[in-house]
Design a protein with these regions (language model features):
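Inter-heme linker and motif-flanking segments adjacent to c-type heme-binding CXXCH motifs
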Residues: 1-206, 210, 217-226, 241-252, ...
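Long, compositionally biased charged/polar accessory segments in the mid-to-C-terminal portions
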Residues: 214, 230-242, 258-268
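Short, aromatic-rich amphipathic segments at membrane interfaces
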Residues: 244, 256-288
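Selective detector of the "anchor" transmembrane alpha-helix that sits immediately C-terminal
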Residues: 283-306
Length: 309
């Protein structure tokens, strides 16, 4: 291949032989995917071509031809709902609706030629290629060992694998959507910590929304609050940081980000209230000025009438 493209990789076959597909083919299984199943036969196009069967937008559809076929996959005794789950995931939506071709698809996590199912010990390493800070915090957290001892995967325990939904604050705490209650029950320390963190997320989120509404009212009234609006962005950033810090499973670390955000939100709230108070003061001043002007005009009119008489 060097004469056609010196930089082109030529290890695809070697990788394929290490994959689940390759090993089963070597064992005599003729149903597994081979080169032409993914790349087609005559209509082979580079992966960068949107018409290619291995273009990022089309990879999941290529894999589903086998993996979403219940009858075809019956003998392998593995799930066949991966495509349905992935189609509803935040990753698929980011790719299809958001046009983000760097969003994960099947081969991002499983590999392509060397395709293999990621084990519990390796799945978080796959996720960490994008979610770096979350992975670093989790690696130092007490849940790292607890999950490993229980045979639970790091990321997928809370976020699932194929059907990954957009994370929300409702996932923390003791509500119906909480993932904490899958392991923690009322009365234990973890349950209480989860409730406390959920409450603080809620408090900061409400504080940010309250300040935002005040500043918007002030701005619509013509008051200058652009500096406060910029400061409020810092409070929003603190909320985002707190959500990332949650992966340390350290209430103290989360509190640091929440407390910083609350201080900023309170400061911007006070700026909004001050702006609205100044608006009312200006309105009152305008009313007094108008009243004075009207009184003066009335007095002048009366004086002129008297002069004419």
């Amino acid at each position: 291949m060097r004469q056609y493209n010196p930089s082109l990789r030529t290890d695809q076959l070697a990788q394929y032989k290490t994959s689940v597909h390759g090993k089963k083919l070597a064992g005599g299984d003729q149903k597994v995917a081979i080169c032409t199943d993914c790349h087609t036969v005559h209509d082979i196009r580079p992966a960068s071509d949107p018409r290619s069967s291995v273009h990022p937008l089309n990879v999941a559809d290529t894999c589903k031809r086998c993996h979403a076929d219940a009858a075809y996959m019956k003998d392998y005794k593995i799930p066949h709902d991966q495509y349905a789950g992935y189609s509803a995931s935040v990753h698929r939506k980011a790719m299809v609706e958001g046009g983000d071709l760097s969003a994960p698809t099947c081969t991002t996590c499983h590999g392509n030629h060397g395709a293999a199912p990621p084990g519990l010990a390796t799945v978080e390493n796959v996720c960490s290629t994008c979610h770096v800070f979350q992975a670093q915090l989790f690696d130092k957290s007490p849940h790292k060992k607890a999950f490993a001892d229980a045979g639970m995967g790091g990321c997928i325990t809370c976020h699932s694998n194929h059907r990954i939904s957009h994370p929300t604050d409702a996932m923390v705490g003791s509500g119906a959507a909480s993932v904490c209650t899958n392991c923690h029950s009322k009365g234990d320390a973890g349950f209480q910590t989860a409730e406390n963190i959920a409450g603080k997320f809620r408090d900061l989120s409400e504080a940010v929304d309250s300040s935002k509404n005040l500043l918007e009212r002030a701005a619509h009234s013509g008051m200058e609050v652009s500096d406060a609006e910029l400061e409020l962005d810092a409070a929003k950033d603190n909320l985002t940081k707190a959500r990332v810090s949650l992966h340390s499973f350290s209430a103290k670390r989360v509190d640091e980000d929440i407390d910083a955000g609350m201080k900023t939100a309170q400061k911007t709230r006070e700026a909004g209230l001050a702006a609205l108070k100044q608006r009312e003061y200006r309105r009152m001043g305008l009313l007094v000025s108008l009243a004075t002007i009207l009184a003066t005009v009335g007095a002048l009119a009366f004086y002129i009438r008297q002069m004419e008489n």
